[in-house]
Amino acid sequence: MHKVAIFGGSFDPVHKSHIQIAKLAFKSLDLKKMIFVIAYTPPHKTKQYAYIEDRISMLKLATGNMQKTEISLYEAQKLETVYSYQTLDYFNSLYPEDEIYMVIGSDSLLDLPIWNNIDYMAGRYKFIVAKRHGFDEVNKNVKYLDRCVFIDKETEDISSTEIRRLVKEDYKKAVSMLNKKVYNYIIQNGLYK
């Protein structure tokens, strides 16, 4: 049975930590494929800053040289909130012979119990958990730990929120957090001003 990872997010913008997580997941789990799923409107967010077309373009630039990856517009084309279990069910229907994983950050572990339909989701799928800076060892009482595979290496402490703030204040400060092509795209298209 092969492993297919679903990496969902708003990618507003996609940054170096997103790509680092994807590469570490490939290395740790010998994945068949990583599918980046761009959310139209994530359930936990109220606003997007860049148009969906710009977020797709930036993700294509960031993943352009990565093998065994694809970008899915499954959620984006719905034009509404799509819950994680629905996305995983969709990809499970496309890859019924494979094991489906969802990529999350370790900071999301504590929130899992409040995710929509989480018991169903955790019963069918597994999570690839990327360590986030500042998130100490996972509390052993966290629910669903047995459904998690942890990436041992901590990823860079980068957030899309911080990048948007830096671009607005002084775009040169954001350059180290972004793929060079993504950075150039943001500047050339006047995003996050």
From Swiss-Prot:
InterPro entries: Cyt_trans-like, NadD/NMNAT, Rossmann-like_a/b/a_fold. Pathway: Cofactor biosynthesis; NAD(+) biosynthesis; deamido-NAD(+) from nicotinate D-ribonucleotide: step 1/1. SUPFAM superfamilies: Nucleotidylyl transferase. It is an enzyme of class 2 (transferase). CDD domains: NMNAT. Keywords: ATP-binding, NAD, Nucleotide-binding, Nucleotidyltransferase, Pyridine nucleotide biosynthesis, Transferase. One of its GO terms (biological process) is NAD biosynthetic process. It holds the Pfam family CTP_transf_like. It catalyses: nicotinate beta-D-ribonucleotide + ATP + H(+) = deamido-NAD(+) + diphosphate. Its EC number is 2.7.7.18. One of its GO terms (molecular function) is ATP binding. PANTHER family: NICOTINATE-NUCLEOTIDE ADENYLYLTRANSFERASE-RELATED, PHOSPHOPANTETHEINE ADENYLYLTRANSFERASE. Belongs to the NadD family. Catalyzes the reversible adenylation of nicotinate mononucleotide (NaMN) to nicotinic acid adenine dinucleotide (NaAD). NCBIfam families: cyt_tran_rel, nicotinate (nicotinamide) nucleotide adenylyltransferase. This is Probable nicotinate-nucleotide adenylyltransferase. It comes from Endomicrobium trichonymphae. The gene is nadD.
